[in-house]
Each structure stands twice: as C-alpha cells, then as structure tokens.
Amino acid sequence: RDAKMQGLSEKCIAESLSQNIIGFEIDKEQREKCIERLDRTCALSGIENVQWNILNQDFLAYKASELKASFIVGNPPYITYHDMTEEERMYLKEHYEVCRKGRFDYCYAFIEASINALKTGGKMIYLIPFSIFRNLYARELRKYIVGGMTGVVDLSGEKVFPGITCSVAFLLYEKGKYRHEILYEEN
C-alpha cells in the first residue's frame, strides 16, 4: 500500500518484489504454500504476476555470504542437537563458528549465516527459541550476536505455533552497529 501511495504502478511494484526478495524453503510443498500466500496478499492490493524468487533449496548450502542483504526476516528450523543426524552435526561444526563446541541447535547456524549475508547496516529479524538466551551451549552464539543485537521481543508464554510448546522471541539485529543498550520488550 505504501508503494501505491507513493505513486508506483502495480506493474512496477510486482517487478520490484520479483527483483528484491529472495526466500529459501527446502520443502517443496511449503514453498508452494508460501508463494500462494504471497500471491493472495499481493492480490488484495491489485498486484499480480510477481515472479517470486523463493528457492527450493537449503539456505545453509547456499552461498549466503554473497547476498549482502539489506533486510533478512526469518524463522529458522528448531532442531535440537539430539534430533540431528551425525552428518548434520559434522557439517555444522565444520562450517559454522557458533556450532564448533557443545550441543548446539540447528538454528544457531542459520543465525550466523544470516548475519554473514547482511551488508553493513543491514537488519535482521528472526523468530528464535528463547532458550538461546539461557542455554549453556548457546554461549558462542550469544557472543557472536551481542555486538549487533538491537532488541529482543520476548514472546514467552504466548502460543505462537498451534500444538507446539516452545518459548520464542524475536531477535532484532543490525550489522556493523555496536549497541550499548538493547531494547527488551515482553508481550
């Protein structure tokens, strides 16, 4: 709606969405659902024929550090160390600094990869397990993110995902901007 109020045509908006958004979904069915939802949302504003760049690919296998994104919004998979295969554990240990020690969760690698995919001044908002702020094995991750962390929105106690009991929070991050204060908000 904002782009329309600025006088941009539906065609121009559709082209911009096609060129400036990239997404990753490893599950083909979920990828298709994502595109359908995006199309429905755009249709509400009269925007059609967006050629979505939603890749059916593992984000961690993509050369994300080459993206230099302005914004990253995500909800990484919540897979515990216990639920990973030995092959997955070894891959993450070899490729991600925050996964070299202890019993890391899969989402730690996503957070590191996303930070590396940001350009300087780029911002990230991730919906993450709240346990990251308490878990002993998340210490390396906390060290990694603390410099650019701008805020935490604590959703503990909220039923964010139907049928799933997991306390979550939004992590707000800005690359290259060290903060002496971090916004903390409870919902």
PLM feature spans:
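Conserved SAM-binding loop of SAM-dependent methyltransferases across substrates and taxa
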Residues: 1-16
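Signature of N6-adenine DNA methyltransferases within the class I
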Residues: 4, 26-35, 45, 49-51, ...
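Short basic/glycine-enriched coil/helix segment immediately N-terminal to the Walker B
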Residues: 12-18, 65-68
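Short Gly/Ser/Thr- and Asp/Glu-enriched loop/turn motifs at secondary-structure junctions
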Residues: 16-19, 49-51
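Conserved SAM-binding motif I beta-strand of class I
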Residues: 20-25
